[in-house]
């Protein structure tokens, strides 16, 4: 997706506003844990925070121990990352003896993947920071389409002066009522490089126009927790990975790291959920582990209306993502 100089200027304006809503201020030291290649998140957030008057630390993706050392060496105040990578940084930092509470870090700007409330709360508690989400997609600009303010953290303000939004039924394409769930459709109003009209994002959300407690009058969208094309159909039942994530983040014995496998057994769909135990939750007793497994399976079945097989994985047994986390492995016969 191409950008001209005008597009880059508009993009950085949108990011600067988003960052300011999240509590970033001129003079902040912003450490970038996104890559700077063809991924739009890195450059967009870099230029936007720079326009706000921040000092940028272009650390890039990977090398987690170096990231943690740089927070201490440079006095980083803002971290830009995916939430799954921020959680991985928590774990590595604690293993190294890094004191998050004593660090200069105070704000997390997260994007690239959904951040459920349970995961956000865990990162905030372990890093001693305030975490906010932002939303965007490469096809219409990149990050900066909408962002979370500190007054009402369950929604994100849409940059309505740059994007015309619609919410439609994903099956029929017909508009849905205000506050009703549907597929977000966006038309960039200022994009010149590659303009698009009524771009169907496949992201499921609802939009609300009532005023926000922060005083901004921009419409707010619910945080995107699923996509119409992420949906798994298991034995005729619609299952979203976000539903599984919501259940697992509410169970204190397991970490937010998980892996979903779908395969065919005897001509039927089988759903397998691998979830990682916290070290303090591990028990030598087979009966205790089996009881925990059964409890998780029952909670998932109550939400999904499909009975999954639950596998408990040892601490650290699920691979950590540096960029966007890939949670689903669909092995079904095509």
Language-model features: locations:
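Active-site phosphate/ATP/adenylate-binding loop shared across adenylate-forming ligases
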Residues: 1-132, 140, 145-150, 154-155, ...
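Conserved active-site and cofactor/substrate-binding residues in soluble primary-metabolism enzymes
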Residues: 3-6, 10, 84, 114, ...
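Conserved beta-strand termini and adjacent loop/short-helix elements that scaffold enzyme active sites
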Residues: 59, 134, 168, 263, ...
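Conserved AMP-binding/adenylate-forming
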Residues: 106, 115-211
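Active-site glycine-centered loops adjacent to acidic/histidine catalytic or metal-binding residues
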Residues: 112, 136, 236
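Conserved C-terminal "lid"/linker of ANL adenylate-forming enzymes
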Residues: 297-334
